[in-house]
């Protein structure tokens, strides 16, 4: 009798341990929350004034690849890229936004010849490893153009036109080593005064 009770107690204890382990596993590793599909909006890059001055002094003129746009705002350049798709968390702003168009830098070699450096299909990745990337070269290789500092990013939500919107702003963009090397190689007169490229803002319309 005692032997049967002992075996039953042991079985119940073992079942309790297994159940507890399973519950802990579910609590420790919950499934990741998926971001919401992005159906529109825009990514903007506002160059820092010192960077804008370095471009001007170095004889480099910024331009855009349609459907992106470019505007002079005070002593800075504002690139605007329409968002084509992606996925963002409405709560944290973490995710990925793909845009159309691109940016071009032109530099004069002689009175009649110019050199260009272009980047298209920009993508902003926010979150733990935040970067701004673009496609460059005949092989269509994607390169990191800038690393993004998300430590002071301002994430806000709003509603307009029957859609939810997420804005991720105040994100400093630091020029990547690859982009810096490309710029100084193609445009020898260009000498960036700092690695900070500018500030990136993502305003995304969610599905």
Enumerate the predicted regions with their spans.
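Intrinsically disordered low-complexity regions specifically enriched for long asparagine
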Residues: 11, 28-29, 114
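Bacterial N-terminal signal peptides that target proteins for export
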Residues: 2-17
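N-terminal segment immediately downstream of the Sec signal-peptide cleavage site
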Residues: 33-94, 170-207
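Bacterial N-terminal signal peptides
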Residues: 16-27
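Intrinsically disordered, low-complexity boundary segments flanking structured domains
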Residues: 28, 66-68, 134
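Predominantly extracellular/secreted and cell-surface proteins with exposed
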Residues: 70-144
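N-terminal membrane-targeting segments
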Residues: 13-15, 31-34
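Extended amphipathic ligand-handling, pore-lining, and cofactor/metal-binding catalytic surfaces
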Residues: 129-178
